[in-house]
Amino acid sequence: MGNSPFKVGLVIPILNNFDQAVDLIYSAKTKENELKVYIQPQYRYQLPLSQAWNNGMKQAIMDGCDYIIIANDDTLFAPWSIDAWVSAMSKESDNIVLTAPLHVGDTFDEPFEIVFSDEDTEYKYVEKELFSMVMVRADFWEKCGWFDENFDPCWWEDNDMHYRITLLGFNIKKYEIPYIHLGNQTTKKLTKPINSIKSGEYYLKKWGSQNRNLIERYKTPYNDSTLTPKDWIK
């Protein structure tokens, strides 16, 4: 793929965390690329989170986006993060199908200060939850399939996709590009135990174990040899 400018889609499912979602949108800056935001109104239609991700990706693909960022509504960018991230991923081989930035929350007294930082800021990089903010190319779904929409309302869909990526022989890469994840601001307000158990049970049915270390009992969904890791049955 050539040099920028690229068309970049930013997919943000929003359930109940409106203030921080607005902060996230405020923080999303680009000087070198074209950015379009795709709000997924979970506050109106409570879809599984994975379905909201898929819908946002489809909208971005329809609009011709080259790269798609999927972000939790409790995350923040530095002003230069998106351009640096797109530039880095545009240089990767096709084997790197998903990339992520690194959390720099320990750098600041107040998380929102990241929006006033620049490339000379001495960030303290820390690994956080991988799928709180990720970037894929527009052809990601062709290589890895869509996110499994059976995880309802959420939980485990990220473990599922990470395992699928591994089974398919692809890789994930993290960059020293800054972002902040405030952490579980939306799911905190959900009734976790019952829903989380339900999603975990589905993961167990699908993969035969719940190790979550990229080594599960089954190598094909539901132990069905006619399926590939890209597949899931609604």
Question: What annotation goes with each model-predicted range?
Answer:
Residues E142-T166, F170-I180:
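Donor nucleotide-sugar recognition loop
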Residues L98-F112:
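Short beta-strand-to-loop element that shapes/binds the nucleotide-sugar donor at the catalytic cleft/hinge
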Residues S117-V136:
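A recurrent flexible, glycine/aromatic-enriched loop bordering the glycosyltransferase active site
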Residues L24-L35:
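Short, acidic, metal-binding catalytic loop of nucleotide-sugar glycosyltransferases
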Residues K174-P193, Y202:
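Active-site donor/metal-binding and catalytic loop motifs
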Residues C65-L76:
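Short beta-strand-to-loop acidic/aromatic patch adjacent to the donor-nucleotide binding site
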